């Protein structure tokens, strides 16, 4: 539902990598899983506060993330982010959460300001 969308504001810097997705993505993958798809496409160095390189192929990164999310959504014994949240709320749930999955990967490039 549009009224239930999670909206945030961030101050972006040059070369920041932005991953946007539907609940089908974030209910099934942890940040570490997403990084495993980004890092093979990344040339440069990074830390939690600095990004110095470029993604070689944002489409390949997005495809990897979507595919991994779909794979995890169908695993019945996986402790997904959704399952973890459900269990913390007292609702017994185990496995991924099959859902539609939308992923957008972009990298900020301020040279065209």
Locate each region found by the language model.
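C-terminal catalytic subdomain
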Residues: 2-21, 25-113
